A protein has these predicted regions:
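Basic, helix-initiating cap at the start of DNA-binding domains
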Residues: 1-22, 26-38, 52
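Amphipathic alpha-helical segments used for helix-helix packing
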Residues: 96-117
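Short, solvent-exposed amphipathic helices
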Residues: 71, 117-128, 132-135
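Alpha-helical DNA-contacting segments of helix-turn-helix folds
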Residues: 54-61, 68
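Hydrophobic alpha-helical connector segments
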Residues: 56, 70-96, 139, 149-152
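Short hydrophobic/aromatic patch on the recognition helix
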Residues: 37-47
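A secondary-structure capping/hinge motif
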Residues: 51-53, 107
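Hydrophobic/aromatic-rich alpha-helical bundle segments in the mid-to-C-terminal region
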Residues: 119-124, 139-188
Length: 191
């Protein structure tokens, strides 16, 4: 028995791919409907507006980020090694052709207005990443955990922006993000 993908899921997957690869403002509901092969009426039945679809995509991206984070770090025995594992995986990702930057940074760039519905979702995601970095930095014995967390946060976002700007080029500024993270972590944790 063949299982079919629900139209809502097809619409969402299509929109997610298009938003990530081309941006939020560049993609309209006509493009999503055409690419998915599903009519606009069905799209609007599931997502009353493009903004609703963007917010749903951001929530899904947040869930995916944390699932990946846990998967990447679960084998690392210490908090220091969890941070290092994350940045090694980040380096691999930002240098891959599958990376188009960070969906949350991309959103904030295209919709800088604080009252935009997706803006708060992006801020909440970024704050939770900073908090997790800070927790791991404290557990790793960093002399100044908040300072380390902020530096790692900026390094991560810089790597995402480099991926968006330079693509998967080995000459990308993100090509040594894991090495720089290790220097920051080791400098703060006394290694």
């Amino acid at each position: 028995m063949k299982s079919e993908v629900a139209p809502k899921d097809i619409l969402f997957q299509t929109a997610a791919r298009l938003f990530y690869q081309h941006g939020y403002r560049a993609i309209g509901v006509d493009t999503i409907a055409a690419e998915s092969g599903i009519g606009k009426m069905t799209l609007y039945r599931h997502y009353p507006s493009k903004d609703n679809l963007i917010v749903a995509y951001l929530h899904d991206s947040n869930k995916l980020f944390w699932n990946n984070f846990e998967q990447i770090t679960k084998e690392a025995p210490t908090s220091r090694e969890k941070l290092l594992a994350f940045f090694e995986a980040l380096q691999d990702y930002v240098l891959s052709p599958a990376c188009y930057g960070c969906p949350f940074l991309n959103l904030a760039t295209e919709y800088p207005e604080a009252n935009y519905p997706g803006h708060q979702v992006a801020i909440e995601h970024k704050q939770s990443v900073r908090e997790r970095f800070n927790q791991l930095a404290e557990e790793a014995g960093a002399r100044q955990p908040e300072e380390l967390a902020n530096a790692l946060f900026l390094l991560m976002d810089g790597a995402y922006m480099a991926a968006r700007m330079f693509g998967s080029s080995p000459n990308s500024p993100a090509a040594n993000v894991a090495k720089v993270a290790r220097q920051l972590i080791d400098g703060q944790c006394g290694f």
